[in-house]
Curated annotation (Swiss-Prot):
Subcellular location(s) per record: Cytoplasm
InterPro entries in alphabetical order: UDG_fam1, Ura-DNA_Glyclase_AS, Uracil-DNA_glycosylase-like, Uracil-DNA_glycosylase-like_sf
GO molecular function terms noted in the UniProt entry: uracil DNA N-glycosylase activity
One Gene Ontology CC term in the entry: cytoplasm
Species classification: Bacteria, Bacillati, Bacillota, Bacilli, Bacillales
EC number, UniProt record: 3.2.2.27
Location of the active site: 65 (proton acceptor)
Organism name: Bacillus cereus (strain ATCC 10987 / NRS 248)
GO BP of this protein: base-excision repair, AP site formation via deaminated base removal
The UniProt record lists the keyword DNA damage: yes
Entry-linked SMART domains: UDG, UreE_C
Main location, first listed in the record: cytoplasm
Family: Belongs to the uracil-DNA glycosylase (UDG) superfamily. UNG family.
Protein name: Uracil-DNA glycosylase
């Protein structure tokens, strides 16, 4: 679990890979991957950072931990691999997108198109044991992903943080630079979406902010596969 980051995240996060917490985490993961089924695949763990460089990050959508079913997780929060049924929270995200922009709900949950446009799809925990939600919570990933948020907070160029639900909103304390923007609501989960996610218009809010900054807006439409 060494620093495999090829883009500008590599030098920024290099000190983390040398820290005691990360060494313990790496040892834990080595054991987990050899004795259990763990998601995502090792080579996909850092995909959020690989697809969306530090310099190119415009938006952060913060998730919790990866999907724990077969072939779902591939290192991007909320996203699933092609050919996999769209999970309920993502389906609600698509419904809100349809209500905002009139886009048809796509036949897949593959969000790489967002990541390639500067939407950092970051989970706070980057691995999970099959069938056991939150099984890698408290093992060290939170220190690592907090550092990612802190580094973005230090950036001069504003970032838009989308915080859905209490877990994501707990990270607000790391976002102290007033240049940045925070968009928050309840989580898109079926348990809470009707209590304020639907109608919150996060996607058009993002694009309004980007337009006001003179930045290219995000094309949120996910194509059918």
């Amino acid at each position: 679990m060494e620093n495999v980051l090829k883009n500008d995240w590599g030098p920024l996060l290099a000190p983390e890979f040398e820290k005691e917490y990360y060494r313990k985490l790496a040892g834990f993961l080595k054991e987990e991957y050899s004795t259990h089924v763990v998601y995502p695949k090792k080579e996909d763990i850092f995909n959020a950072l690989e697809y969306t460089s530090y310099e190119n990050t415009k938006v952060v959508i913060l998730g919790q931990d990866p999907y724990h079913g077969p072939n779902q997780a591939h290192g991007l929060s909320f996203s699933v691999q092609p050919g996999i049924k769209t999970p309920p929270s993502l389906l609600n995200m698509y419904k809100e997108l349809r209500d905002e922009y009139g886009y048809d709900i796509p036949n897949n949950g593959y969000l790489v198109k967002w990541a390639e446009q500067g939407v950092l799809l970051l989970n706070t925990v980057l691995t999970v044991r099959q069938g056991e939600a939150n099984s890698h919570k408290g093992k060290g990933w939170e220190h690592f992903t907090d550092r990612v948020i802190e580094l973005l907070n230090e950036r001069e160029k504003p970032v838009i943080f989308i915080l859905w639900g209490r877990h994501a909103q707990a990270k607000k304390k790391l976002i102290t630079n007033t240049k940045h923007h925070i968009i928050e609501s309840v989580h898109p989960s079926p348990l809470s979406a009707r209590r304020g996610f639907f109608g919150s218009k996060p996607y058009s809010k993002v694009n309004t902010i980007l337009a006001n900054m003179g930045e290219r807006e995000i094309d949120w439409e996910i194509p059918n596969l």
